[in-house]
Amino acid sequence: MKTRIAEKFQTLFQTEGEFFASAGRINLIGEHTDYNGGFVFPGAIDKGMIAEIKLNGTNTVRAFALDLDEYCEFGLNEEDVPQQGWARYIFGVCREIQKRGGEIAGFNTVFAGDVPLGAGMSSSAALESTFAYALNELFNLGIDKFELARIGQSTEHNYVGVKCGIMDQFASVFGKAGHLMRLDCRSMEFEYFPFAPDQNGYKVVLLNSCVKHELVGSPYNDRRNSCERVAKVLGQEFLRGATMEQLEAVKDQISEEDYLRARYVIGEEQRVLDVCEALGKGDYETVGARMYETHWGMSKDYEVSCEELDFLATVAKECGVTGSRIMGGGFGGCTINLVKEELYDAFIEKAKTAFAEKYGHEPIVIPVVISDGARKLA
């Protein structure tokens, strides 16, 4: 990928630039906990975005998206947001840096990525983080890593129209090879936990169902509202920190639906803590067991799964896979699977054939390795 970028950069701009990269991410466990003030447990992966960048001595940004074969340029003082969706991310990062008092100038760039689109692995965060990190380095802006992540988040909010949380950008900026990060979404404190499945006889693989169910209404908002209603009854700002005993005590004051939603979230908080403790002991069996619990909690209590993802999790269990669950918001997308190496090939074959027989197409197999986040490449 780097070679292809360099060739195109030379063709377009007759010069050479510097290379920067960032990563997509997985979230091992901790789903729908972020907006409840809880914990998430992401890691950067070996699929991401690479950009070659060189200052051009003007006030204009000239950008080429190699994967799409599209070109865009915009002035750094222009108010008009570019029409191309991908260019909005670069424009937004530039604008958010300027809002924070960062002085930047025009540059040329060619970029490409290998984060599978639509798989819930945060290709957009990888793009934002690559450019935020690169501009911070190239212009010696001195912006700390947390603010780089917030620049990515603000770009989504203000220029793309996606009201995302901070997890994706955080993982993309702070990612560290061989480690997952437990992020406290209330305090924004985080801790690295060693995660080296390959050294313990395991692989991590995503199975993309390639299904995205169109939804009537606002299912994410509905679930968030459920959580907020229960938190209010409990006299808390967030569900974070609530116990099952407290929930049972107010069961007759809330709807059955709100009860089930809250039961999932409170359980998920504990599962994140359980997984962190288990990893400290090298206990991958407990990690896997909690992943299955999360899947069926998301399916039965939170009701954000779908038939295809339940099918993949069921096949995983039948094949002896250590852990499997929905990854992401739900209603389609991927399962994330923790598989013993000796079972890997048989599981992949079974999942592909069984899924194709039932749904008419194979899931896309995406093996991942936990890797570094935003960085400059040699």
Set out the residue ranges of the language-model regions.
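Gly/Ser-rich oxyanion-binding loop with an adjacent helix/lid
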Residues: 1-20, 26-39, 73-77, 83-196, ...
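Short Gly/aromatic-enriched secondary-structure transition segments
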Residues: 37-44, 223-224
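Short, charge-rich binding segments
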Residues: 42-44, 52-55, 101
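A structural signal for short, well-ordered beta-strand segments
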Residues: 109-111, 207-209, 335
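FabD-like malonyl-/acyl-CoA
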Residues: 125-126, 334-338
